[in-house]
Amino acid sequence: MNLSLFLARKIFLDKGDKRKVSRPAIHIATAGVAIGLAVMIISVCVVLGFKHTIRDKVIGFGSHIQVGNFLSLQSQGTEQYPVAMNDSMMNVLKHISGIKHVQRFAYKQGLLKTNNDFLGVNFKGVGPEWDSTFIANSMIEGTIPHFDDKASHNKILVSKTMADKLNLKSNQKIFAYFIDNNGVRARRFTICGIYETNLKKYDQIMCFCDLYTARKLNGWEEDQVSGAELQVENFEQLPIVANRIIGKVNKTVDHYGETYSSSTIKEINPQIFAWLGLMDLNVWVILGLMLAVAGITMISGLLIIILERTNMIGILKALGARNKTIRHTFLWMSVFIIGRGLLIGNIIGLGLIVLQQYTSLIKLDPQTYYVSTVPVEFNWLYIVLINIATMLICTFILIAPSYVISKINPAKSMHYE
């Protein structure tokens, strides 16, 4: 066995050590590493969970990529211009590499009115191909109706925000009013369900109806819609797939003379994704601070251990041990201390994350954070990398302090107590 490793194990595992300073120093160093690692694991898991939860909510309302009329996309949705989305164009979009799903949609602005109040909303017409998974997971009352593109069933979904403002309930009848060049038109709808995503930007205005109704209210032809929403197979490949769509679809013209264009969800919601991007910077700051805390406590602990083991160092030097061997002994001991800290830190960090995941113990204000509880997400690769980086960095920064050993004079140190 390596002499340095053997000596380090004997010192580290010595339960009969009565030294008054080094043992507390070891405990403090271990605690510093453990707390630092636990905070790093919790920070990464919470930020990943938060980013992906908010991202999935935004994508749930607008998918990954939208293909529509150039004028509509340029106006950022404030004005609606139709574009032809017939079977031919749908097939073109479906066969672009990296596309997972394609669905049509049409917007129409209107008013929901009760006997006591009214509310301006944006009706989003969807067809039978609509992927309702996101809204289904957000339903709090009622059911999702079958949305058709060939006939109107006068059924809608509203958000909890709308329901609270207008005092609406599932299966209730409500009148909606639409204003166009021909005047005011009224429609009577049945509220089939109520959803809640806590994404205020959409919950305040988004109301779902069938594609046929939205298209007819806009006065468009049978193959005209606001556009198509495209889901990609891999979100990380979004820029690549977007470029393929640009090359295939953008600047082409439909048979009505309207020009096609496309936008990614990041271009449609730049503020939200910029805000989510800032969280990465926060994580790096936290990681740096926690590594600094762990490193400083380890340096302090190592110097205290060396100071109290000065007599032993002198004896080893007198017996012919080289400075390198003695330095490696204390570095190995530091590795054992760091290892114990990592074990404790993993137990604390992962334990708290599991507790939050299954109990939702820590609550948040959904009006501010868009989620009602702190979201967490495990990423074992990141957790392993954090452990490895902590071990390597903490060990590396101890190399310089360990050179204090070379300054110790064996003749004087053997008399040191």
Feature map (PLM): residue ranges:
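N-terminal Sec/SRP start-transfer signal
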Residues: 1-37
